[in-house]
């Protein structure tokens, strides 16, 4: 058994003194003071905040096929360092988890290497080519969390509609990277004033919002839970808000980088600022914040997307899309939204715990007696600088290097086992 002493937990929106007794994988007791018994392993929280473990429904672990960028081991170590106890990896690997054989192989890699709980997606279509549906019932039987072709949009309405019908039959969500290929126009960043200034091809807002508009109507017809990945535009927020008001089962996520940065933050032709969807306008960012606060957007997910340094050293036109985010999400959001009074600590924690779990009907995301001992101890008071050399991820492709932040996790526990502690 383990006993966390001298911690603080959120109760009714306020930090309250609490000890947490852990028996095996579950929390046995939460109380203001618990006397330790002989032989118990005591963890001194030293007055720090003890949060439910965070749940990230959108990461890229790259394995199999892209191990030079990230592995399941390094990606989940990075997640633990960031306070995440559950992550859901996208299927844009090689091979794609699009069959029982491929999914079983992926699950074995997870079982052998993961440092946190991993709930893998299966693809919607074979090899994510958008031409042939996978075997939904067989993949659910193997443990598919949900279905997505993330990394690309499903281009034909008929294929998406048929996929939604199959997903509804097995009571799983269709999770969509929304991007109409005919509207990308070879873009490498947001189509706006900054792309014009830099002379870099831009991706217009409608590239995303048009496909969301199509899909919410398909989801309504199919009776399917439809989840929108990394919303980035004001038009997308409007479409999702209207769909929810119409009673369509649509949910959505937003990334930390789209909440924190805009096209105006891009200093030049620097691929560290290249992600998909791209950093949008100030108006778009404001719409995302409004949508998150009013419930149009359900939760925050990182879209952790590691790449090798030489890949991101290329010009924006040639470099791959994506930035890492597992190790920086909470500190950045806490520093920029909670410490300045825009959000409460409870709001931020909910966006990373209860909200994603409610979105996908998961049994995690809370600290409660008889619940899983998934938690992270966070130092809310000490300032640290984000340094790439401190990352446990293989990659450090993020524009947030050098930022000074508060709210750094100092210990993370998954099902009662310590998976990250300080610099270990």
From Swiss-Prot:
A GO term, aspect molecular function: allantoinase activity
Protein name: Dihydroorotase
Family membership noted in the UniProt record: Belongs to the metallo-dependent hydrolases superfamily. DHOase family. Class I DHOase subfamily.
Function, in words: Catalyzes the reversible cyclization of carbamoyl aspartate to dihydroorotate.
UniProt-annotated catalytic positions: 303
Binding-site residues, Zn(2+) 2: 150, 177, 230
Pfam families tied to this protein: Amidohydro_1
Pathway annotation from the record: Pyrimidine metabolism; UMP biosynthesis via de novo pathway; (S)-dihydroorotate from bicarbonate: step 3/3
GO CC term (a single one): cytoplasm
Cofactor: Zn(2+)
Gene encoding the protein: pyrC
Keyword Hydrolase annotated: yes
Residues binding Zn(2+) 1: 58, 60, 150, 303
Cofactor note: Binds 2 Zn(2+) ions per subunit.
EC number: 3.5.2.3
UniProt enzyme class: hydrolase
